[in-house]
């Protein structure tokens, strides 16, 4: 089965209404690959604003976080019910910035992923290694441990998109070579085959993230197990359109 090309744009803590309107207008006016699925993740307080201004049927909106409880005394958190109330059906979970800056563990991320999926929200689940882990030759083992923590919590993977983002490449200008990225993507798919099922391994989309731009996206997209991208800084720029159209 051919896996549909997927591009996510993680705006992180960037943009005002004026900035985001310009980004959305650029997407609305662009000729986008009709065979690409696109999801953009603005800051939480602009989710509805972005959603109201989007006019492309194949572009959806994602949250950058969701909590693992339905409601209650959890200051600053967002529930799945609240996201669904806005019509938001995607969320990014496990990003290294939340793992490292906010101390989110593999287990906590897995519990949030399960909660989102159980409530009908699809998940872009992030994994990836540090520079030290890469240099120690332990990248694949590290990523497999992250996958194992997730697999303990979830059984149904059909609404999970995996994003491999080597931490040393996020926002640094460094980028994994297409061979480095393909090696890890293939290892992730192999792990899914061995530990989940052939069907999940074949159907799950695995994205690459980490300093993706208009110059390197086409070569990366040609690799067998790279099914798209999770884009950070470049998603705020006009070149995001070129990344979406990497297969054209």
UniProtKB/Swiss-Prot annotation:
Source organism phylogeny: Eukaryota, Fungi, Dikarya, Ascomycota, Pezizomycotina
The protein's name: Triosephosphate isomerase
This protein's GO CC annotations: cytosol
Subunit note: Homodimer.
Positions contributing to substrate binding: 10, 12
Reaction equations catalysed: D-glyceraldehyde 3-phosphate = dihydroxyacetone phosphate
Gene behind the chain: tpi-1
Catalytic site: 95, 165
Top EC class of this enzyme: isomerase
Pfam families linked to this entry: TIM
Organism: Neurospora crassa (strain ATCC 24698 / 74-OR23-1A / CBS 708.71 / DSM 1257 / FGSC 987)
Pathway it works in: Carbohydrate biosynthesis; gluconeogenesis; Carbohydrate degradation; glycolysis; D-glyceraldehyde 3-phosphate from glycerone phosphate: step 1/1
């Amino acid at each position: 089965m051919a896996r549909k090309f997927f591009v996510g744009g993680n705006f992180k803590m960037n943009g005002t209404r004026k900035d985001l309107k310009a980004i959305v207008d650029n997407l609305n006016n662009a000729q986008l690959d009709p065979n690409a699925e696109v999801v953009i993740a603005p800051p939480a307080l602009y989710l509805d604003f972005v959603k109201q201004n989007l006019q492309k049927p194949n572009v959806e909106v994602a949250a950058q976080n969701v909590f693992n409880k339905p409601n209650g005394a959890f200051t600053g958190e967002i529930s799945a019910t609240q996201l669904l109330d806005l019509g938001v059906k995607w969320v990014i979970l496990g990003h290294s910035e939340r793992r490292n800056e906010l101390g989110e563990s593999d287990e906590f991320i897995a519990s949030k992923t399960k909660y989102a999926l159980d409530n009908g929200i699809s998940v872009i689940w992030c994994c990836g290694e540090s520079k030290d882990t890469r240099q120690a030759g332990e990248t694949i083992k590290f990523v497999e441990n992250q996958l194992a923590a997730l697999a303990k919590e979830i059984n149904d993977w059909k609404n999970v998109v995996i994003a491999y983002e080597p931490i040393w490449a996020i926002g640094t200008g460094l980028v994994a070579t297409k061979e480095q990225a393909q090696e890890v993507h293939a290892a992730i798919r192999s792990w899914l085959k061995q530990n989940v099922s052939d069907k999940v391994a074949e159907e799950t989309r695995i994205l690459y993230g980490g300093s993706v731009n208009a110059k390197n996206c086409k070569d990366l997209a040609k690799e067998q197990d790279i099914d798209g991208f999770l884009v950070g800084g470049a998603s705020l720029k006009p070149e995001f359109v070129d990344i979406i159209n990497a297969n054209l």
